Amino acid sequence: SMFGVISAGQPRTHAGLRKIGFFYLKKFTVGRRPLSLYSYENDVIRPLGEPRVHFALNCSAVSCPTLPNIAFTAQAIEQELDNEARRFINDTRHVRLDTREQVLYLSEIFKFYREDFVPAHSASLTAYVNRYHVTPVPLDYRVRFIAYDWTIAAAPR
C-alpha cells in the first residue's frame, strides 16, 4: 500500500482511501495481472496459508504492523517472518496482558484473520500468541480485541 500512498498522495484517514477505491478499485500490475490490494492480499497472499504475513503487511494505518526496514528475501523469509511476528506480538500497542482481570487483549488483526491463525496453526489465538510472546499467557485467559485505529500513520520525522 505504500506505493499507492506515494503515487496517490497521503490521505488523512482510511475513509479517504476507501472513497478513491484505494484498496478495492485501484489496480497494480503484479506478474502482468492487474490486481487491487484487496485482491492481492486475499487471492494471492492469504491462500499461501502463512499467518505471519499479517505481521509483515502494512496498510499505512496506525494499528498496522510497523513497516519493516528490510526487504524480505527468499533465503531468509522464515526468520524474517518470525522476527515480524515476535515484534508485533511483543508490542503493547498490539498485544497486552491484564493479569488482574485475566484478559489477553489482541489487535483486531487477530479478529479480522482469525481463520488464518486458528485452527490451521494453533488450537486458539492464545496458543498462537504464546509461540512468540516473551511472557507465556495462560490458556484460560479471556480474549478481547483492541479497537483498530484506521488513521493514516504519519511518516517519522
Across the structure, where does each feature detected by a protein language model lie?
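Interaction/scaffold regions that mediate signaling and macromolecular assembly across diverse proteins
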Residues: 2-157
